[in-house]
């Protein structure tokens, strides 16, 4: 249970039971019955107790006063402690956060269910009650915001005077490719062959570059949020580690770029894994997506094929499901695709894997590190093939389509390279490109200042690539990207 779930009690209590998993009703009934039994037991034991609940013996006025004060303190002090703890446990550096850590709390913000199972439902619940979102600027006011809005309205008019199209005249597909990156860029690592030759060629002929990731080995949803909202994680306080879990559930409305395409039917999400991860199922509804296709539903993704011994749905299958959605309608859409094929761990999943990795330092790779890297390389090469085939199919369509493709972070398998702090930047750079099909009229476009970027800038870059007009907000992102290429 999340704090945001309590909104159902006042807004949608009638449908609350429909959100519970199968069998949950019996679990609740058993818990209520057990609680009632405990209460009855305590009442019975109280009657057997000669003191009748008194902490100190004695029936005089002073003893009664001492008992009353003791009872009051036993109620107030724990209540005060719990209140103060709940208000501060989500803030980095607070006494409550330190206390929780000492007591063994290990936040698992990627999955609220796992977090509750690992740390306890109450701990998982309280950490999301009062997260510190961001520091309020000293000069923040209505007047200041009006000035900012006017400044970027003017900037948007200047940009739009030189552009002729609209983003919503095309279908735009965001592809977050799980852990996709170039192993040949990892310091101290030598690979026997290129795992991404086709994507490398695609990058040479369209807008492309390197993306600075805020994560290494994880943090997918944060990069996803940045791409959809245009907001960087750098905007938030360090206490806010997962917007999907700590911020979005409590927001009445969350502005996301897919909403430019109007009605919810024009926004589709696809992710071949569990819909509960990062609370995506509920968050995507709030973002304005009509469907979010996953393995667990309620909208079930159509293609679920896996490759050899891999436990994850292949990118080829995910692209097939995406193509089906694109072909379903003549209308233009926004599609958010989050792949799973290259998710960790990596244990000799693929047959006929001829990829090899060795160390260029005086320390050879450990067996488990080498196995993971070589398995990952094969997976990346399969992504390379599937992505090229996907774009080829989009090129056959008669309607304009633009694809924003990016790897969210490097896989957390380079233990040798990550041991050296000097390799930090290299281990946080992935590949991205913005590509348009023939029907778009912007195929082959290459915009300036594309060598380095971050997901929050992709929408502004896509607009420039598509020669599309911008809103004041996109004008702001365009101007910021021209001054600061990458913000993690």
Which stretches of residues belong to each language-model region?
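N-terminal secretory/membrane-targeting segments
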Residues: 1-169, 190-210, 247-251, 255, ...
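Short, hydrophobic/glycine-enriched beta-strand segments
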Residues: 170-177
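Solvent-exposed soluble domains appended to multi-pass membrane proteins
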Residues: 157-163, 177, 182-488
């Amino acid at each position: 249970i999340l704090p945001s779930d309590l909104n159902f009690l006042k807004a949608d209590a009638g449908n609350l039971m429909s959100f519970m998993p199968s069998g949950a009703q019996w679990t609740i009934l058993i818990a209520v019955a057990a609680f009632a039994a405990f209460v009855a037991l305590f009442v019975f034991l109280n009657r057997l107790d000669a003191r009748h609940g008194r902490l100190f013996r004695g029936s005089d006025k002073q003893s009664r006063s001492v008992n009353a004060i003791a009872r009051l303190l036993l109620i107030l002090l724990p209540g005060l402690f719990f209140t103060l703890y709940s208000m501060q446990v989500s803030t980095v550096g607070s006494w409550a956060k330190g206390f929780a850590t000492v007591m063994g709390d290990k936040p698992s913000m990627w999955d609220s269910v796992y977090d509750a199972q690992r740390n306890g439902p109450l701990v998982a619940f309280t950490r999301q009650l009062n997260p510190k979102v961001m520091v309020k600027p000293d000069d923040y006011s209505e007047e200041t915001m009006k000035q900012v809005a006017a400044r970027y309205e003017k900037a948007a008019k200047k940009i739009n005077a030189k552009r002729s199209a609209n983003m919503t005249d095309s279908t735009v597909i965001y592809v977050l490719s799980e852990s996709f990156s170039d192993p040949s860029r990892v310091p101290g690592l030598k690979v026997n062959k290129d795992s991404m030759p086709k994507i490398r060629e695609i990058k040479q002929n369209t807008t492309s570059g390197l993306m600075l990731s805020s994560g290494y080995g994880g943090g997918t949803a944060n990069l996803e949020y940045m791409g959809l909202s245009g907001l960087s994680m750098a905007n938030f306080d360090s206490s806010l580690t997962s917007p999907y879990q700590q911020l979005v559930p409590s927001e009445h409305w969350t502005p996301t770029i897919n909403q430019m395409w109007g009605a919810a039917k024009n926004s589709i999400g696809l992710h071949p894994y569990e819909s509960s991860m990062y609370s995506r199922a509920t968050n995507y509804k709030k973002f304005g997506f009509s469907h979010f296709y996953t393995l667990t539903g309620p909208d079930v993704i159509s293609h679920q094929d896996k490759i050899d011994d891999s436990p994850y749905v292949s990118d080829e299958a995910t692209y097939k499901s995406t193509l089906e959605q694109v072909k379903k309608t003549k209308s233009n859409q926004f599609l958010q695709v989050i792949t799973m094929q290259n998710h960790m761990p990596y244990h000799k999943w693929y047959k006929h894997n001829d990829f090899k990795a060795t160390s260029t330092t005086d320390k050879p790779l450990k067996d488990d590190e080498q196995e993971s890297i070589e398995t990952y390389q094969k997976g990346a090469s399969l992504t390379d093939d599937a992505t090229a085939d996907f774009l080829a199919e989009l090129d056959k369509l008669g309607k304009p389509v633009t694809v924003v493709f990016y790897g969210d972070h490097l896989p957390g398998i380079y233990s040798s390279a990550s041991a050296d702090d000097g390799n930090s930047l290299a281990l946080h750079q992935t590949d991205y490109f913005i590509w348009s099909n023939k029907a778009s009229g912007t195929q082959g476009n290459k915009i300036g200042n594309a060598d380095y970027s971050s997901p929050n800038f992709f929408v502004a870059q896509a607009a420039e690539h598509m020669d599309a007009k911008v809103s004041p907000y996109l004008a702001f992102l365009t101007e910021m990207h021209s001054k600061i290429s990458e913000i993690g």
